Regions:
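N-terminal catalytic or cofactor-binding beta/alpha core of small enzyme domains
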Residues: 1-333
Length: 333
């Protein structure tokens, strides 16, 4: 079911949805200053696009189908390819790592989250969603690693980031981008990424990077520690709602646990390089996405929506006084 049709419950297509090339990327404009990005939940694997391999390549040929082609069932004979491997070391480039693992159920969580947010506030977040499987294109990497030379994948990549830029332009004043992901780390905590590495958080050294919430820090005259693990940090609010999170007052740093600091989307579209729109990456553990079943997933998505409402009220001048308290959900995780 198309995302906007899910939100409205209407059988007829809704006119304000915007689609990229062959419908691989979907943008549903909202009417508030929150953007939800879901880059790794797609399932489409069109056979006319090459899979992303474990090593980046300098060039790759792709047969691009005509507009209107059945991209799900297309049967296209591809030309022989000549692939050239990059030989220089990429070990120090964190963006160069090639992963093709999908973040399952992140789209489903986003649907419930957005619907709950709108029901609570009367305002709908902007949504940008990639329907391609990550084995075809990864919006959370620089284009050379996202597409590996595939021209169609490069076009889809540009669609994704252009839609985020369009959503940001539609925000008047400060705003927030939430980039939704999934991870399978053993600690089963929600990992909240502001671009600080695990080492920086462990050492409480916040001077080595400009965070993706720099606008928030400037506007409210806060120190990084306040927004990372203060009582009214996003991690603090998630913990109060019953969900283990890092960083948070309970766990201000990851220690030896694995931790994702925020990727290309957070770096590119947050306020680390200026602007009023911040970005935060949320890495959701497998137990909340699928291991404990659909009821836990749905409850979590609703609770996350209410936490975001509270966070937006606190830091982004949102008047959502009719919102139901997160504590009324009674969630524990």
């Amino acid at each position: 079911m198309p995302f906007l049709q899910f939100l409205t419950g209407e059988d007829e297509p809704v006119s304000d949805v915007k689609l990229g090339i062959h419908g691989f990327v979907e943008y549903i404009p909202g009417n508030t200053n929150l953007v939800i990005s879901v880059p790794h939940g797609g399932e489409m694997r069109p056979p006319f696009m090459d899979d992303r391999d474990k090593k980046p390549k300098t060039t790759r040929n792709t047969v691009v189908p005509p507009p209107g082609a059945d991209v799900k069932n297309a049967n296209v004979n591809k030309d022989d390819e000549s692939l050239v491997l990059i030989t220089e070391s990429l070990e120090d480039d964190t963006h160069s790592k090639i992963s093709v693992v999908a973040d399952i159920f992140t789209q489903e969580i986003a649907k419930i989250l957005v619907k709950e947010y709108e029901e609570c506030t009367g305002r709908r977040p902007h949504v940008v969603m990639d329907h391609l499987h990550r084995c075809k294109m990864d919006p959370n990497r620089p284009i050379q690693y996202a597409a590996l030379g595939d021209k169609l994948a490069e076009g889809v990549f540009k669609n994704y980031h252009n839609f985020i830029s369009e959503a940001k332009k539609n925000i008047d004043g400060p705003g927030l981008l939430i980039d939704l992901h999934g991870q399978n780390h053993h600690q089963n905590s929600i990992e909240i990424g502001y671009l600080y590495t695990r080492g920086m958080l462990n050492q409480e050294d916040y001077s080595l990077v400009t965070p993706s919430v720099s606008s928030l820090l400037r506007r409210h005259q806060l120190q990084p520690a306040d927004i990372l693990h203060g009582d009214e940090s996003l991690g603090g609010m998630m913990e109060e709602a019953g969900y283990r999170s890092c960083p948070s007052p309970r766990q201000p740093s990851p220690g030896e646990d694995k931790y994702y600091k925020g990727g290309y989307i957070t770096q590119t579209h947050g306020s680390s390089s200026g602007g009023e729109v911040d970005a935060i990456q949320l890495e959701l553990p497998s137990e909340l996405r699928h291991e404990r079943g659909p009821e836990v997933r749905e409850r979590f998505a609703r609770d996350l929506a209410r936490v975001l409402v509270r966070f937006m009220q606190k830091y982004y001048a949102c008047d959502n006084s009719n919102v139901i308290s997160v504590s009324e959900t009674g969630s524990t995780t």
